[in-house]
């Protein structure tokens, strides 16, 4: 595509690539930054359709979700920090709070799903079109 590196795809001034190597959300973001981009942000239905198509074409026969650049930055759990009986939370047994988002393999990458950030998945990088 004009302006993008070989095997990257262009859409409205940005370049995209789906990487099959798997990593945690942090690993994936770091890798994208090293390749002059970030994990993909998705700002419209049209862009979502473009990224979905790219992911489903690249990740055929894959059983993984695919990381995008969305993460819940809040440090607290999404739900209110209190038991239903009113007692406060003094003990937690949570593997890892679910705070990172990926495209869901079960819907052929059409919908977003929240996942533990430490899960290892392929990912989609997005960078600005070099001028």
UniProtKB/Swiss-Prot annotation:
Record's keyword terms, sorted: Disulfide bond, Hemostasis impairing toxin, Platelet aggregation activating toxin, Secreted, Toxin
The family line of this record is: Belongs to the snaclec family.
Which domain of life does the UniProt lineage start with? Eukaryota
Which stretches make up the C-type lectin domain? 11-126
Example GO molecular function: toxin activity
Summarize subunit and interaction data from the UniProt record for this chain.
Answer: Heterodimer of subunits alpha and beta; disulfide-linked.
Principal subcellular localisation of the protein? secreted
Expression by tissue: Expressed by the venom gland.
Protein's name in the database: Snaclec bitiscetin subunit alpha
Q: Organism source for this protein? A: Bitis arietans
Q: Provide the protein's localization.
A: Secreted
Mind naming one GO cellular-component term on file for this protein? Answer: extracellular region
């Amino acid at each position: 595509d004009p302006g993008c590196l070989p095997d990257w795809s262009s859409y409205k001034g940005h370049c995209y690539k789906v990487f099959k190597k798997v990593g945690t959300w942090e690993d994936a973001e770091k890798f994208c930054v090293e390749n002059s981009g970030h994990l993909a942000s998705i700002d419209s239905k049209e862009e979502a359709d473009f990224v979905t198509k790219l992911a489903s074409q690249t990740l055929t026969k894959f059983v993984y979700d695919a990381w995008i650049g969305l993460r819940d930055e809040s440090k607290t759990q999404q739900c209110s920090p209190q038991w239903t009986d009113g007692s406060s939370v003094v003990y937690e047994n949570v593997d890892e709070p679910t705070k990172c988002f990926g495209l869901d393999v079960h819907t052929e990458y059409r919908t977003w799903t929240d996942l533990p950030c430490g899960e290892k998945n392929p990912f989609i990088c997005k960078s600005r079109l070099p001028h």
